[in-house]
Amino acid sequence: YKRGGGGWGGGGGWKGGGGGGGGWKGGGGGGKGGGG
């Protein structure tokens, strides 16, 4: 889907993601469930 440097997340976007690091689902933030 969407990957690289944050994906859907990006600073608390879609589902309260931390942004940066991971891509679409999981990972170091971004996508679903980030660092806060």
Curated annotation (Swiss-Prot):
Stretches the record annotates as Disordered: 1-36
Highest taxon above the source species: Eukaryota
Keywords: Antimicrobial, Fungicide
Name used for this protein in its record: Glycine-rich protein GWK
Known function: Possesses antifungal activity against a number of phytopathogenic fungi, including H.sativum and F.culmorum.
Organism of origin: Cucumis melo
Any one biological process term the GO annotation gives: killing of cells of another organism
